[in-house]
Amino acid sequence: CLSKYDDALDAEGVDDNPGKQRLEKAIAGKYTAEIFGRIVGREACLALPDAWAFDPEAGSRTHAGHVTQLRRYHGVMADVATALIDRCADLTAAALAGVIKSQDLSTPHTVGILAEGTLFWQTEGYRERVEGTLNRLTPSHVQVRILQNASDVDANFIGAACAALL
């Protein structure tokens, strides 16, 4: 499901390990605005009214928030923004479903996934889409819940601690 836009982003991102971490580049908020700009064109992003305009090539000064707000715009820009955010959610769900299915859970289970990031917690409908898609992709006896890290502890440390307990 990766596109020529993903390929270009990967090839031109010399500091971002070309050829590696392809899924992360397709789903992470860090890259969303740049992919959007590659789809609609930099000029189209810059030509938007001031409240909506952004430079998709501005590196760390641009982010998924620029794209998520465009879902409320109109026309093709809103359609592309919606499709891109939905694709991020669906690819995230597919990757997580693969991990869950690899566990070969044969009895009823509730699986909790600790998620962090602005797409999950600041993008309307994103978490729900990931959760819904995950539940469709996993066996019916497995219920998946996306959990928010409400502590000040980095989610990676929490995950490492949980893995160490297994």
What name fits each language-model region?
Residues 1:
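Small-residue (GG/TT-enriched) beta-loop-alpha framework at ligand/catalytic clefts
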